[in-house]
């Protein structure tokens, strides 16, 4: 049985004080979430400690926005699994299109991050997705398959989440058609060779389209960017209604 994972990625937003204001508003909404939905927030690293304290005793889990493959060392600007575990972090996003784009992260590095997360008890959320140029050239499936096969090598597929995020839909207001997103998620599950693989969709997810997205048979959750920055909007997404 595949579980439902609804994750909000705050990216480089929210100070500790604004994060506290957000959580104070969000927690009352969270009491209405169905018990079988795993709701996750990925704040910036500076706010993790604050949220860890505020979320104690709630049904909301923490994720980091990245994790390094070494536990200590001369890796400026990185964060290790043990640093995250100290603050009750449960998930770690790896391979998001922004680090891939701005810091030239390779599939091999993303695989190292995912394996490090798993070996330390974190659940990696491994992001994959194509650019608009790759899609227009008919390369989308080849690109995503490579990301899946290289990114998941030597990982435990029972203890990770895949997030399909077409790059052209992230922060643009353009959403991949639900049927097409569902088709790609089905292919990802096929390429991975594991029918119970948990797969999210990400890319301009918002309250107006969440019910349709979550009605798709091969989509198990969402990775939300901009819409997760508003507590009421993210609560509506987490409390989606099945069609």
UniProtKB/Swiss-Prot annotation:
It catalyses: D-glyceraldehyde 3-phosphate = dihydroxyacetone phosphate. GO terms for cellular component: cytosol. Keywords: Cytoplasm, Gluconeogenesis, Glycolysis, Isomerase. It is an enzyme of class 5 (isomerase). Pathway: Carbohydrate biosynthesis; gluconeogenesis; Carbohydrate degradation; glycolysis; D-glyceraldehyde 3-phosphate from glycerone phosphate: step 1/1. The keyword Translocase does not apply. Homodimer. Involved in the gluconeogenesis. Catalyzes stereospecifically the conversion of dihydroxyacetone phosphate (DHAP) to D-glyceraldehyde-3-phosphate (G3P). This is Triosephosphate isomerase. It comes from Prochlorococcus marinus (strain SARG / CCMP1375 / SS120). The lineage of its organism: Bacteria, Bacillati, Cyanobacteriota, Cyanophyceae, Synechococcales.
């Amino acid at each position: 049985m595949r579980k439902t994972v609804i994750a909000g990625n705050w990216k480089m937003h929210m100070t500790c004080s604004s994060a506290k204001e957000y959580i104070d508003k969000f927690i009352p909404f969270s009491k209405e979430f169905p018990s079988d939905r795993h709701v996750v927030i990925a704040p910036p690293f500076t706010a993790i400690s604050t949220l860890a304290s505020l979320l104690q005793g709630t049904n909301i889990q923490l994720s980091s926005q990245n994790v390094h493959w070494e536990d200590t060392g001369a890796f400026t600007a990185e964060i290790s699994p043990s640093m995250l575990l100290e603050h009750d972090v449960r998930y770690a996003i790896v391979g998001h299109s922004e680090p891939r784009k701005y810091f030239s992260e390779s599939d091999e590095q993303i695989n190292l991050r995912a394996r490090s997360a798993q070996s330390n008890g974190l659940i990696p959320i491994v992001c994959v997705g194509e650019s608009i140029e790759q899609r227009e050239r008919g390369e989308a499936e080849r690109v995503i398959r490579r990301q899946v096969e290289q990114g998941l090598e030597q990982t435990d597929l029972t203890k990770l989440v895949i997030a399909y995020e077409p790059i052209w839909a992230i922060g643009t207001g353009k959403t991949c058609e639900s049927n097409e997103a569902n088709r790609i998620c089905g292919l990802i599950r096929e390429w991975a060779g594991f029918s119970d693989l948990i797969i999210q969709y990400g890319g301009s997810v918002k309250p107006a389209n969440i019910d349709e997205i979550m009605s798709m048979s091969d989509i198990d959750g969402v990775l939300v960017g901009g819409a997760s920055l508003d507590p009421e909007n993210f609560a509506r997404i987490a409390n989606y209604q099945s069609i």
